[in-house]
Amino acid sequence: MLKKILVFCSILFAFQSMVLAQNEIVKPLTIGQTVTLKSKILKEERTLNIYLPLGFDKAKSYPVIYLLDGSMNEDFIHVSGLVQFFNQMYAMPQTILVGIANVDRKRDFTYHTDVKDLQKDYPTTGHSDQFISFLEKELKPYVESHYKTTDTYIFGQSLGGLLATEILLKKPEMFNNYFIISPSLWWDDQSLIKQAKQLLSKSPDTKKFVYVSVGKGEHPVMVKDAESIYDILKNSNKKNWTVEYKMMEGDNHATILHRSLYEGLVKMFPYKEPK
């Protein structure tokens, strides 16, 4: 008798599974698109992960965020969610996110150094000039030829923060808004910090938002360097620059990015109660 009950239950379960399978509809979940761009400057193909806001309209103009370390297995997915959240809950307009997937971030995000130990430990480094040229002459024109755009942002952390700082100081006109998280300004014996005042003296005083952040749990050199670049930027007498700083009390170098970007976006788009 027990055997018959078990057989009956097995048949019933199999039948229910078949019915459920017939009724379900499975579709892929898509949050963006992936584009392969052939770069003549870098002499390689580069992968772009692009998030378009809900209801994207080709006839409308949108701000664009350029995200360094923008691979699917890096920061693209969680930053896409942050952008969507700030559009839904805060005053952030609908925004396009362009994640730039890495090939060799040490090569692309660092400038030349004569420090022998760095040359030995990081043999491919020192080509940020080429990557910046790629951003300026190939990537941005590609994006602007496919979408109508307004303000531009660059998000960078660690070596990406070093690159974002280098662009801000040497080619500030490339972006309107700079989010510089835990920048590796120790690179090349802090030469970028040492040059900062001179470079800023040549920069036009056009409207900019600059956000610098570091985690309290990071190496003391990282904290000191972030504070130093913030102080230099804040005291540069740029009347049209908004310069913000945030010490992330509970974060270290590994945990800081998402929460710090959140805090930076809050400074740009503070919450307002709906009327």
What are these regions (language model features)?
Residues Y147-S158, Y178:
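Alpha/beta-hydrolase fold nucleophile elbow
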Residues G161-P172:
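Short glycine-enriched nucleophile-adjacent loop
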Residues V212-V214:
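Short beta-strand/loop motif that positions the catalytic acidic residue
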Residues M1-E24:
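Bacterial Sec-dependent N-terminal signal peptides
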Residues V35, V64-F134, E138, Y142, ...:
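Serine-hydrolase catalytic machinery in alpha/beta-hydrolase-like enzymes
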Residues V19-P63:
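A domain-start/cap signature at the N-terminus of enzymes
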Residues K170-K207:
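Mobile cap/lid helix-loop segments that gate and shape the active-site cleft of serine hydrolases
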